[in-house]
């Protein structure tokens, strides 16, 4: 299953021309500094600085240091931050198209993820534009895994356990295996795993 992480920004902000002086943007992400997701976001910020000759400087705020992941979309929509990175499938309850890339086994390779992205991009961009957001780029995620402190040999082993759910699809998977879906922000996941919370 491939997920597409999305960078979004206020359309009005992007439409405004950059001033001759340096313009500074904040870009919050809920992911830690040395993760795949944040490294991609930092590369984007570096590329923008280079492409604009330093006229637009984007500061990446990793590890939910500026906003927690569930707050980022609203912070961008309300203009509290100029851009933000979040997983769009977390908003599949707003529109099923936002979760198309989290349907289990629909896109099981990078090439399949690219085809799915290409097919869904125009409709996704329109939905986001209707919400005052602009898609800047998407990144295919590597495969997902489940981690447990004890071996999970049968479906019965999941009964009553807590399972991190970050979108409607992972919530449904937890329900199907009779686990308890819980919301744990990525920045807090290490501690939750260590304490068994």
Q: Can you name each region flagged by the protein language model?
A:
Residues 1-4:
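Positively charged n-region of N-terminal signal peptides that target proteins for export
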Residues 13-21:
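Sec/Tat signal peptide C-region and signal peptidase I cleavage site
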Residues 24, 54-57, 152-157:
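Short, surface-exposed connector motifs at secondary-structure boundaries
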Residues 26-43, 63-68:
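Extracytoplasmic "Venus flytrap"
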Residues 43-58:
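Signal peptide-proximal N-terminal region
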Residues 45-46, 77, 82, 87-180, ...:
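Contiguous mixed-secondary-structure segments that line small-molecule binding/active-site clefts
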Residues 53-57, 72-86, 179-181, 195-197:
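Alpha-to-beta junction loops
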Residues 61-74, 166-169, 181-195:
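Short helix-initiation/N-cap motifs at beta->coil->alpha
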């Amino acid at each position: 299953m491939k997920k597409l992480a999305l960078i979004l920004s206020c359309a009005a902000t992007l439409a405004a021309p950059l001033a001759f002086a340096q313009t500074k943007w904040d870009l919050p992400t809920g992911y830690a500094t040395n993760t795949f997701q944040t490294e991609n976001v930092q590369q984007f910020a570096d590329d923008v600085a280079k492409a604009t000759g330093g006229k637009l400087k984007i500061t990446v705020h990793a590890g939910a240091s500026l906003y927690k992941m569930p707050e980022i979309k609203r912070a961008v929509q309300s203009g509290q931050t100029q851009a933000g990175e979040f997983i769009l499938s977390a908003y599949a309850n707003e529109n099923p198209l936002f979760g198309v890339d989290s349907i289990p086994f629909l896109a099981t390779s990078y090439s399949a993820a690219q085809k799915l992205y290409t097919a869904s991009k125009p409709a996704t961009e329109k939905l986001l534009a209707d919400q005052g957001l602009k898609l800047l780029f998407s990144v295919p995620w590597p495969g997902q895994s489940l981690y447990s402190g004890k071996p999970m040999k049968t479906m019965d082993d999941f009964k009553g356990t807590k399972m991190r759910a970050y979108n409607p699809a992972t919530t449904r998977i937890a329900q199907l295996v009779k686990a308890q879906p819980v919301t744990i922000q990525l920045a807090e996941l290490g501690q939750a795993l260590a304490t068994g919370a």
